[in-house]
């Protein structure tokens, strides 16, 4: 039930009994789909609140390489972070290895052991060449991650500047690879998705699958080449009268 413009958890708004009964909390920053990011203090608060309980935390750090305004913090850098949390990393985004399904988790040893046990019973293993490629990427391509981040930051800046100029309402993307655009008056997310596809040949993701508060937003990927993104931006800004008319 998170709301713009920060999309950060407020534990005080959750029923204490619900928190007491909660076994697992799943956080993801930079956030998909909203593009919001967390500060270290957000993780500090979460760890301090749950470190003496039976509740554990999983932080999905798939978009760790993409932090445009500040460096993305790790929950494991919080005091006692490793006592209560694990962090999940993916090579799909930062290293352009989508489809290879390569990732890893670090953190709380008991959670890692449980994950290892589950993995042993559900997965026969990964093709060795993919593991070798992933290992090589991790050991040799830190500079590439910097370039990736700069590429997406530039796309974000250009895209948002055009939306702002046309007075289209959006949530400022602080990290990740998506933009979170509000729908025009009279449209929910699925209706606007259909409209954009049929009338503008633009494919977006409706916000409703991400929760009911996403019903008046659509997710737009910045993972396009500059020419495609420029064309899509022009088609979107042509709709300014739908928002401002």
Predicted segments, located by residue:
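Conserved glycine-rich beta-strand-loop-beta hairpin in the small C-terminal domain of fold type I
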Residues: 135, 151-160, 170-182, 214
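Residue-level recognition of strand-loop junctions within catalytic nucleotide-signaling folds
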Residues: 108-109, 139, 182-184, 223-225
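Helix C-cap/helix->beta junction micro-motif
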Residues: 52-53, 166, 200, 243
């Amino acid at each position: 039930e998170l709301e713009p413009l920060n999309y950060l958890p407020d534990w005080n708004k959750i029923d204490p009994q619900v928190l007491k009964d909660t076994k697992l909390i799943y956080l993801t920053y930079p956030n998909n789909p909203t593009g919001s990011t967390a500060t270290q203090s957000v993780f500090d608060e979460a760890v301090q609140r749950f470190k003496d309980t039976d509740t554990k935390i999983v932080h999905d750090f798939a978009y760790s390489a993409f932090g445009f305004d500040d460096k993305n913090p790790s929950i494991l850098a919080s005091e006692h972070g490793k006592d209560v949390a694990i962090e999940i990393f993916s090579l799909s985004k930062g290293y352009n290895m989508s489809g290879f399904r390569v990732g890893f988790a670090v953190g709380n040893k008991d959670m890692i052991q449980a994950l290892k046990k589950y993995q042993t019973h559900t997965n026969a293993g990964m093709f060795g060449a993919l593991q070798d490629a992933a290992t090589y990427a991790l050991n040799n391509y830190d500079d590439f991650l910097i370039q990736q981040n700069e590429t997406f930051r530039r796309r974000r800046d250009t895209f948002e500047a055009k939306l702002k100029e046309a007075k289209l309402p959006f949530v400022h993307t602080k990290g990740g690879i998506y933009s979170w655009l509000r729908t025009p008056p009279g449209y929910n997310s699925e209706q606007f998705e259909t409209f954009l596809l049929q009338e503008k040949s633009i494919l977006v993701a409706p916000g409703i699958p991400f929760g009911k508060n996403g019903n008046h937003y659509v997710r737009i990927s910045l993972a396009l080449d500059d020419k495609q993104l420029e064309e899509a931006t022009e088609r979107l800004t042509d709709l300014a009268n739908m928002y401002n008319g």
